[in-house]
Swiss-Prot record:
Coiled coil: none annotated. Pfam families: SlyX. Belongs to the SlyX family. Gene3D superfamilies: 1.20.5.300. The gene is slyX. This is Protein SlyX homolog. It comes from the Bacteria.
Length: 70
C-alpha cells in the first residue's frame, strides 16, 4: 500500500507542476497576443500612411538613362 501512496503523491506533484507551467505558458500567450495585436495596428497605420503619400515627381531608377560612362 505504501508504494501506491508514494506513486499517487508523485503524480499529484507532477500534476501541480504541470498546472503551474500551463498557467505560466497561458500568461505568455496572452502577452504575445497583445504584442501581435499592437504590431498589426501599427502596420495598418503605416500602410494607410504609405498609401496616402503622394507619388514623387522623380523618375524611378529603372526609368533613368545610365550615365555616359556605361
Amino acid at each position: 500500500m505504501d508504494n501506491i501512496e508514494h506513486r499517487v503523491e508523485e503524480l499529484e506533484m507532477k500534476l501541480a507542476f504541470q498546472d503551474g507551467t500551463i498557467e505560466e505558458l497561458n500568461q505568455q500567450v496572452i502577452k504575445l497576443n497583445d504584442v501581435v495585436a499592437l504590431q498589426q495596428e501599427q502596420l495598418r497605420l503605416l500602410l494607410n500612411k504609405l498609401q496616402s503619400v503622394e507619388p514623387s515627381n522623380m523618375a524611378s531608377q529603372a526609368d533613368e538613362t545610365p550615365p555616359p560612362h556605361y
